[in-house]
Curated annotation (Swiss-Prot):
Stated role: Catalyzes the hydrolysis of the adenine ring of phosphoribosyl-AMP.
Main subcellular location of this protein, as a coarse class: cytoplasm
Assembly behavior: Homodimer.
Name of the top EC class for this enzyme: hydrolase
Species of provenance: Saccharopolyspora erythraea (strain ATCC 11635 / DSM 40517 / JCM 4748 / NBRC 13426 / NCIMB 8594 / NRRL 2338)
Protein's recorded name: Phosphoribosyl-AMP cyclohydrolase
Pathway named in the protein's UniProt entry: Amino-acid biosynthesis; L-histidine biosynthesis; L-histidine from 5-phospho-alpha-D-ribose 1-diphosphate: step 3/9
Cofactor: Mg(2+); Zn(2+)
A molecular-function term among this protein's GO annotations: zinc ion binding
GO cellular component term of the entry, any: cytoplasm
Amino acid sequence: MSSGLDPAIAARLKRTPDGLVAAVAQQRGTGEVLMMAWMDDEALHRTLTTRKGTYYSRSRQQYWVKGETSGHTQHVHEVRLDCDGDTVLLVVDQVDGACHTGDRTCFDADVLLAES
């Protein structure tokens, strides 16, 4: 599938063998890490043009817009590329839970190490 992603941006991406880059969503204002998902060039293009968090589902092999069915939307304020080009950071306003479980973040349920 051809993507409308700016070729200058596409050239900077370092993709997995499946053509994906990691995408981390962070709450604007607090810096809270909400979730991690995958994007290909088209998902990134859609996110940049619509300001809606748009991702690629590896299991379903299709695009999904965060909150399209749940109402738990993400309005994207910034998109940044990390220094290696293999991860994008989306700074968002998250409506309700970001995790598919309903939790605020995908990192709420399983703490492996915490300060005592």
